[in-house]
Amino acid sequence: KPLIESGCISCGQCVSVCPTGALQERTTMIKETPVDTVETDTTCSFCSVGCSLKLESCGDMLIKANPDKEGTVNAGLACGKGKWGFDCAMLEDKLEDPLVKEDGAFRDADYHEAFVLVAKKCQSVAAKYGKDSIAVAISDRYTNEEAYAMKRMAEAMGAKVLCMNNRESGLEKVTGLNASPNTIDELLSTNLILKVGFQDEASRVIALKIKQAEEAGAKVMTVCNGENSLALLKEIAKAIIDSGKAKNAEGYEAFAESLESVKVGEAAKAVADVYMNAKKAMIVFTQ
């Protein structure tokens, strides 16, 4: 049976822990040859988990990416994107120099020419339509340092900064912070984990932590892994309210009133009972 048809998630851990060297990874080099590499500590930018990686490079060439065993977030774990996705930095058709469009076609330009052209165009548009007409769009894949540098440049131009994947955070409205109130390692010391709309494929490292917690005795329940998720969540919330165990939450009365007409099904009641009786429970969801 081909490996790709098995439960393999292409994380590369088998290669990393192989004690004999029988398993080896393919390198980005055309010809296999020993090279002296420089190791650089970095953070994976493929998702928001923030796994620590050690990139090995030789000159301008990236050779391999290894998960950092001492990483506070991933502790030596990595997903397929973090382990193998570094080669996107060396794509042959990757844009490396500025291009200027003239007469419907692009031509190469140096950075000075590009900066001057952008500044003049921005000044022209702002003078005609106002400063609010200028915006700088950045990728959510940027590092904090890159995003900060782009923000400073936009401020100098008097422009807005737009992120291409900047969705409104529901978590911030509930907790007041657009970040998890718990750490990933707390998954390993909990009794119950509710996976609400969470797909393992979206975050393999978190999924591995959940699997470790389950092997240590934690109960894992998958909730709303499909359609009609909001209806089931309302039923679970109504069951908890009907139990009388949740009365001190901010905005409780208005929330309880909004659920008065909700009828609680058997599945929702079962989930609510398990959740309320757990000594330590965590909810994992994909926003």
Task: Describe the predicted segments one by one.
Residues K1-G12, S16, G21-V38, C58-M61:
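Ferredoxin-type iron-sulfur electron-transfer modules in oxidoreductases and energy-metabolism complexes
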Residues K31-Q287:
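Catalytic alpha/large subunits of respiratory electron-transfer oxidoreductases
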